Amino acid sequence: MNLQKFPRHPLTFGPTPIQPLKRLSQHLGGKVELYAKREDCNSGLAFGGNKTRKLEYLIPEAIAGGYDTLVSIGGIQSNQTRQVAAVAAHLGLKCVLVQENWVNYSDAVYDRVGNIEMSRILGADVRLDAAGFDIGIRPSWEQAMADVKQAGGKPFPIPAGCSEHPYGGLGFVGFAEEVRQQEKELGFRFDYIVVCSVTGSTQAGMVVGFAADGRARRVIGIDASATPEKTHAQILRIAQSTADLVELGQDITAEDVVLDTRYGGPEYGLPNEGTLEAIRLCARQEGMLTDPVYEGKSMHGMIERVRNGEFPAGSKVLYAHLGGVPALNAYSFLFRNG
């Protein structure tokens, strides 16, 4: 496997810490050891997150090509767009963000706090669009790029989640390599890795990276899209193309993409009672915050898999905390009583 042939522009602090979740592990019976890899603490750029790791492999192309405007898309409370806005500010580039109405959630401040507030503070041109949720290429995003061109700019396209970019999976191939190095220092290997999946390139990169040591199927994706067939297909497609890019030397099959579909409901961006219970439990056991859109759902999935005995006794499970906490303010009504 050859990740080193791809240029990388550092946007993160370096390897993210691995934190033992001792109290949560004991609360859930003590038979499974839980750990968290803190991608939510990976950068000083507007709280960072998993997209910042991905952007390290996209940005060299933008710089080398003389692009002057980063153009991205997401929901109103997109973490992706906030991270793109931060990177643009850091590099002295312009930024146009399309924020679509991906979530059927009504709150008076939903489009004024959290991620979108930060994007505006960072100087991005934020454009609200009424279109609903979809993980594919969006007409509104294509129109934003056309607008930049018409105004004389040179737009660099960054799709939702970085996932449709050919290099979107590379950052999390690097994540797997980073974990392997940390495992040497820890003196043990993780038996399972739990990660939230929506647009797919985070899990896809992990599948490729961990396939190098035989653990592709130990990457447990927890679907938060509530459109799991589309998400599974996109993860597989991205993983296969990423495997070719990094010269993995083995095929990635549909069976290598493990996606647990039980925790994504009722729909994208809307938590269920299990999501909210998991957010509170993790916060009160570990002081670690998760969000109702992504990490609360993957935390719920991990907790239930432990409770149900789906991880064998003695397993060491690594939870990939991808970020997402800046969206909490947009859901303040749900937590008005804690």
Curated annotation (Swiss-Prot):
Gene3D superfamilies, alphabetized: 3.40.50.1100
Cofactor(s) it depends on: pyridoxal 5'-phosphate
Single GO MF descriptor: 1-aminocyclopropane-1-carboxylate deaminase activity
Keywords from the UniProt entry: Hydrolase, Pyridoxal phosphate
Function recorded in the entry: Catalyzes a cyclopropane ring-opening reaction, the irreversible conversion of 1-aminocyclopropane-1-carboxylate (ACC) to ammonia and alpha-ketobutyrate. Allows growth on ACC as a nitrogen source.
Record's catalysed reaction(s): 1-aminocyclopropane-1-carboxylate + H2O = 2-oxobutanoate + NH4(+)
CDD domains membership: ACCD (cd06449)
PTM sites of type N6-(pyridoxal phosphate)lysine: K51
Enzyme class: hydrolase
Species whose genome carries this gene: Acidovorax ebreus (strain TPSY)
GO biological-process terms attached to the record: 1-aminocyclopropane-1-carboxylate metabolic process; amine catabolic process
PANTHER family: 1-AMINOCYCLOPROPANE-1-CARBOXYLATE DEAMINASE-RELATED (PTHR43780:SF2)
Family, similarity comment: Belongs to the ACC deaminase/D-cysteine desulfhydrase family.
Gene behind the chain: acdS
Listed name of the protein: 1-aminocyclopropane-1-carboxylate deaminase
Keyword Hydrolase part of the UniProt annotation: yes
The organism's taxonomic lineage, starting at the top: Bacteria, Pseudomonadati, Pseudomonadota, Betaproteobacteria, Burkholderiales
